[in-house]
A protein has these predicted regions:
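N-terminal leader/linker segments that precede catalytic domains of diphosphate-processing enzymes
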Residues: 1-55, 60-117, 125, 134, ...
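Sequence-specific DNA-binding recognition helix
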Residues: 128
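A short secondary-structure junction signal
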Residues: 116-121, 139-143
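A conserved hydrophobic position in a structured secondary element of the catalytic/binding core
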Residues: 131
Length: 157
C-alpha cells in the first residue's frame, strides 16, 4: 500500500475539532446604563428558527471570517449597531453545541449612546431588553443534567 497521499495530505493539514460542522459566533454585549453594566439581549422574531427565544446577536461564520468579525457583522445586521460602537474585550470560552458546531462568544462593550439609534431587523428580531448584571449575580444559575442515549452506527472492529 502506498501511503504517499497521506503524507502529502498531512504535510499541509491543520488539525481541527473532528466532527465540527461550520461554526458560529455571538456578541455578548455589555452596556453601561444608569451607572451599572447590563447585558443587551434580543428576542427572536416569529420568522426565524426558535421564535421567541432570548439570545445574543450572532450567527454562522462566513468563510475566512474570525469569530470577532462574525459577531460584529451579525450585531450590525440584526440590531443596526455599527462595529465602531463596540469595543471588543475578548473571546470567551467556546462551546460545542448540539447542532454539531462550535459557538464562539465574543465579549464587547457597546457605546450606550448607540442604543437610541439601534434599529433591530424585524425579520430577525422581535425586541430587545437590557438586564443588569446584578440581577444575574443575585440569581445563580440552576443546572439540570439531561442524559439521553445516543444511537450511532457501530464500528465493526
Amino acid at each position: 500500500m502506498d501511503i504517499s497521499p497521506l503524507r502529502g495530505y498531512y504535510a499541509a493539514h491543520t488539525p481541527t475539532l473532528m466532527g465540527e460542522r461550520g461554526g458560529s459566533a455571538v456578541l455578548v454585549p455589555l452596556v453601561r446604563q444608569d451607572g451599572e453594566y447590563c447585558l443587551l439581549y434580543e428576542i427572536r422574531s416569529a420568522n426565524v428558527r426558535q421564535p421567541g427565544e432570548v439570545c445574543f446577536p450572532g450567527g454562522k461564520r462566513e468563510a475566512g471570517e474570525t469569530a470577532i468579525q462574525c459577531a460584529l457583522r451579525e450585531t450590525w445586521e440584526e440590531l443596526g449597531i455599527p462595529e465602531s460602537a463596540v469595543t471588543v474585550i475578548g473571546e470567551m470560552d467556546f462551546i460545542h453545541i448540539r447542532a454539531g458546531s462550535l459557538l464562539r462568544p465574543v465579549l464587547g462593550e457597546v457605546d450606550p449612546a448607540t442604543l437610541a439609534a439601534m434599529r433591530p431587523a424585524p425579520e430577525e428580531v422581535a425586541g430587545t431588553f437590557l438586564l443588569p448584571l446584578r440581577e444575574l449575580k443575585a440569581h445563580p444559575p440552576e443546572v439540570y443534567l439531561y442524559r439521553q442515549p445516543v444511537e450511532a452506527p457501530d464500528f465493526p472492529y
